[in-house]
């Protein structure tokens, strides 16, 4: 069926236009928190992507094997994994592959029609850095969620503490 015929379908046409313009649907109910609430930003992020899941936002993405820690597992359960057996899944189970995650998201953004995101710990963003740099240069519409960003984070010690990362990423034009 060609696109002109599909665009005559009211729902398809609405979804098509929404995906081409990457706009937020009117029926989104944003999570609300009281000022001063002691809530981790990753939990707010999780609530936001769960609300956007299935709202016609065409949000696609996933985590580099850290779904419970960066609070993307709710989204994954709602939209299901993309796989050879489920091409309608919107969760991309990247595994321990930050660079491919970034490169894939860039490709999705360049193609258009979907709004990609990827999530990992901030300390692992260095593995994604070449893709992030290209994303910033091209001003691509992608979201990167970096959690556990404190230099005092975690029982894993210095290997999981992003001490120099924020300064390095601020130096990339258009990134932040």
Regions found by a protein language model. Give the residues of each.
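Thiamine diphosphate
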Residues: 1-176
């Amino acid at each position: 069926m060609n696109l002109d015929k599909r665009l005559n379908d009211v729902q398809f046409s609405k979804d098509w236009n929404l995906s081409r313009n990457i706009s937020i649907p009117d029926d989104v109910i944003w999570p609300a928190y009281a000022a001063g609430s002691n809530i981790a930003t990753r939990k707010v992020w999780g609530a936001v992507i769960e609300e956007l899941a299935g709202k016609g936002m065409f949000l696609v993405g996933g985590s580099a094997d850290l779904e419970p820690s960066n609070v993307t597992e709710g989204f994954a359960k709602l939209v299901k994994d993309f796989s050879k057996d489920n091409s309608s899944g919107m969760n991309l189970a990247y595994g321990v592959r930050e660079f491919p995650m970034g490169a894939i998201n860039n490709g999705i953004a360049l193609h258009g029609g979907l709004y990609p995101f990827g999530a990992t710990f901030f300390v692992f963003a260095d593995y994604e850095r070449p893709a992030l740099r290209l994303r910033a240069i091209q001003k691509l519409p992608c979201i990167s969620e970096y959690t556990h960003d404190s230099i005092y984070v975690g029982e894993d010690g210095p290997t999981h503490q992003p001490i120099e990362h924020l300064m390095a990423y601020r130096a990339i034009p258009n990134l932040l």
